[in-house]
């Protein structure tokens, strides 16, 4: 049975995994109206492989880090599929490199209004921090840099990401290793850059 994959942390990525956790198909949609894209393209993907929700083994989504408005799309979709009694598993983008054998590294992305998210790890030790544009001026990263994708960057991050590895590309190339772990029952709380009440707060 197939597994549906959804990543709405940046733009929309949809995929279908076969019973051996290889990709039937993986499709990315950039710069389109996200809510309409998710519903329309999920329907098209399922139709292309002659599947209905009741035929799925489960759903896997990226739980962040990301913006509330983006992550809520995949969360809401997964909530609807509970009517079909489908299990929902989730994981964080920055977990991917460690699972694939990278013992240390830094995963970086633009966050909320001039802030930048950095997840660093070395073996079993890890840390998370948000830094400002000013902090970037003195930031030194000496290990391998990872990013979600090109759309998760801005000009301020470009000096740090010349040789970066995209976790979206790793996901595309190594689905068995990643989803074999996630489908063992992994479920993460959504990781928003800012709480909803802060993200939608009006500027004074």
Placement of each model-derived feature along the sequence:
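Oxyanion-binding and handling regions
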Residues: 1-19, 88-204
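Short, basic/glycine-rich phosphate-binding loops at helix/coil junctions
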Residues: 21-23, 77, 115
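N-terminal beta-alpha supersecondary unit
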Residues: 1-61, 146-147
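Conserved strand-to-helix beginnings and helix N-cap segments that scaffold or border functional pockets
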Residues: 39, 71-75, 102
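Long, highly charged amphipathic alpha-helices
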Residues: 37, 41, 76, 152-155
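DPxDG-like acidic metal-binding loop motif
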Residues: 58-88
């Amino acid at each position: 049975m197939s597994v549906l994959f959804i990543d709405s942390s940046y733009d929309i990525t949809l995929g279908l995994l076969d019973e051996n956790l290889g990709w039937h198909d993986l499709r990315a949609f950039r710069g389109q109206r996200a809510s309409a894209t998710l519903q329309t393209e999920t329907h098209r993907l399922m139709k292309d492989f002659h599947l209905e929700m009741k035929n799925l083994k489960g759903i896997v989504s990226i739980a962040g880090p990301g913006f509330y408005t983006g992550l809520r799309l995949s969360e809401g979709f997964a909530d609807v599929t509970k009517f079909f009694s489908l299990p929902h598993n989730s994981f964080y983008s920055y977990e991917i490199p460690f699972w694939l054998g990278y013992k240390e590294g830094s995963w970086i992305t633009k966050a909320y209004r001039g802030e930048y998210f950095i997840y660093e790890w070395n073996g079993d030790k890890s840390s998370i921090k948000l830094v400002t544009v000013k902090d970037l001026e003195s930031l030194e990263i000496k290990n391998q840099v990872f990013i979600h994708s090109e759309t998760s960057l801005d000009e301020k991050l470009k000096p740090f990401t010349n040789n970066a590895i995209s976790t979206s590309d790793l996901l595309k190339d190594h689905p068995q290793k990643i989803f074999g772990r996630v489908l063992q029952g992994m479920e993460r709380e959504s990781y928003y850059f800012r709480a909803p009440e802060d993200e939608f707060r009006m500027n004074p």
